Curated annotation (Swiss-Prot):
GO molecular function: ATP binding; UDP-N-acetylmuramoylalanine-D-glutamate ligase activity
Lineage: Bacteria, Pseudomonadati, Chlorobiota, Chlorobiia, Chlorobiales
Native organism: Chlorobium luteolum (strain DSM 273 / BCRC 81028 / 2530) (Pelodictyon luteolum)
Transmembrane intervals: none
Highest taxon above the source species: Bacteria
Protein's recorded name: UDP-N-acetylmuramoylalanine--D-glutamate ligase
Keyword Cell wall biogenesis/degradation (UniProt): yes
Length: 460
């Protein structure tokens, strides 16, 4: 769709979160007639601002006005099966994601990143790499999408030489049809959000694969060859785009001349050694999962033809990401680690593997069909205490109580208090929920900030 095509078009925006509000702003800028429809309460200042600019606004439910539209834009948090979406589809009204909308107006080069785990870390790292190169080349790099900054809120600033590093969830990709990155990366596929996909991991994987559907012959897909689902899907021939596999387990397919891989502590691009892990594994940025994130980031940077020297220097300087195995403080003889970004069991497993020594694990939140058997051995081997918290505390407690001491906490405040009481000296308290945050918090960031605040209140 072209910019001029929006003038006078009727558009319903479903959901007034960050993405929905940014979509409204972009649509209004291009002359669309907008209805913002929110099923819950709406901030009065936001509603007033949009009304003053000519938008219609409704809250506390969706009226039939939603269906008087040329198309709709849906926020990623709105489930696909809710009545308002089903009715839009029944009436054959096109439904797009905010990412799709923003892509119509994007002049910049687009790098797309999706996967179950490592998306935010990898997207942040690639954005830092592109930013470092851009300082030399006179262009800018933007980190947008699921990383927390709506694509629509930045797209008007972007120019042709800029790079938009777009992190994409499966929710956002579901409603993309023409989104076309220059290069894309899939970090991995493990069980997550299966409540949304009828318990079928392949339906979930299909949503992730949509990142590559428009790559075309000039596009490149970087994928994790250590992931059996991705390897089976993309190691075959006959694809319309080129592929770059990466692996932490040595040369991909036994061929040292291709792919990005880790061998003897060195990152290789084909036969070339690029950088040793000792140059970037430090502080909170450690563990084999971060080696995987680095390989994917380097693969994507190479697909974008970014200057190698600047890319590797940006990697050396990368501090890690807030809420992902983030060191918070030493209190009462124990280190406290914030891993609120761990919203599934695989991310919890990665944290358990990365954190050395004995631990107290705080886990729980809103369950997403979790199977804790994947971490049962690690918890038994490393944890002296599990504090099961939030909405899923009973399920978490039942999963681990046969192997380790377990206590339950309804709130995060109680969980921190119980962890502090049970940690003693020399243990690490790891907050790695393995669940969604929506039982008690707005999002994982809100949850992580709350955890850090509670730790800050503890006496040293």
């Amino acid at each position: 769709m072209k910019r001029a095509d929006l003038a006078g078009r009727k558009v319903s925006v479903i959901g007034a979160g960050r993405s929905g509000n940014a979509a409204v702003e972009l649509l209004l800028c291009h002359g669309a007639r907008v209805l913002l429809s929110e099923k819950g309460a709406l901030d009065p200042d936001t509603a007033l601002r949009f009304r003053q600019r000519g938008a219609e606004v409704e809250s506390e439910g969706h009226s039939d006005r939603v269906f008087d539209a040329d198309f709709a834009v849906v926020s990623p948090g709105v489930p696909p099966g809710v009545p308002v979406i089903r009715e839009l589809e029944r009436r054959q009204i096109p439904v797009h994601s905010e990412i799709e909308l923003a892509s119509w107006f994007c002049r910049a080069r687009i790098a797309g990143i999706t996967g179950t785990d490592g998306k935010t870390t990898t997207a942040t790292l690639v954005q830092r790499m592109a930013e470092a190169v851009g300082r030399l080349g006179g262009y800018r790099a933007y980190g947008v999408g699921n990383i927390g900054v709506p694509f629509s809120s930045k797209v008007e600033e972007m120019e042709e030489r800029d790079i938009a590093v777009v992190e994409l969830s499966s929710y956002q990709l579901e409603r993309c049809s023409s989104f076309r990155p220059e290069a894309a990366l899939i970090t991995n596929i493990t069980p997550d959000h299966l409540d949304r996909y009828g318990g079928d991991i392949m339906r979930y994987a299909d949503a992730k694969y949509r990142i590559a559907m428009n790559l075309g012959s000039s596009g490149t897909l970087v994928y994790n060859a250590d992931d059996p689902i991705l390897r089976a899907r993309f190691s075959v021939g006959g694809l319309q785009f080129s592929t770059v596999p990466f692996s932490t387990a040595g040369p991909v397919g036994g061929d040292p001349s291709s792919g990005i891989y880790l061998e003897d502590g060195w990152v290789h691009a084909g036969l070339r050694r690029l950088i040793h892990t000792s140059e970037f594994q430090k502080g909170s940025f450690r563990g084999n999962h971060n080696n995987s994130n680095v390989l994917g980031a380097i693969g994507l940077a190479r697909a974008l033809r970014l200057d190698e020297k600047a890319v590797l220097q940006a990697l050396r300087e990368f501090p890690g990401v807030e809420h992902r195995q983030e060191f918070v403080a030493s209190k009462r003889g124990s280190d406290w680690i914030n891993d609120s970004k761990a919203t599934n069991v695989n991310a919890m497993r990665q944290a358990l593997e990365a954190v050395p020594g004995r631990i107290v694990l705080i886990a729980g939140g809103r369950d997403k069909g979790n199977d804790y058997s994947a971490v049962a051995t690690l918890v038994r081997e490393k944890a002296d205490l599990v504090v099961a918290m939030g909405e899923s505390r009973q399920k978490v407690a039942d999963a681990f109580r046969a192997d380790v001491a377990v206590v339950e906490a309804a709130t995060l405040e109680d969980a921190v208090r119980l962890a502090a009481g049970g940690a003693g000296t020399g243990r690490t308290v790891l907050f790695s929920p393995g669940c969604a945050s929506f039982d008690l918090f707005r999002d994982f960031e809100d949850r992580g900030r709350s955890f850090k605040a509670e730790v800050g209140r503890l006496e040293a």
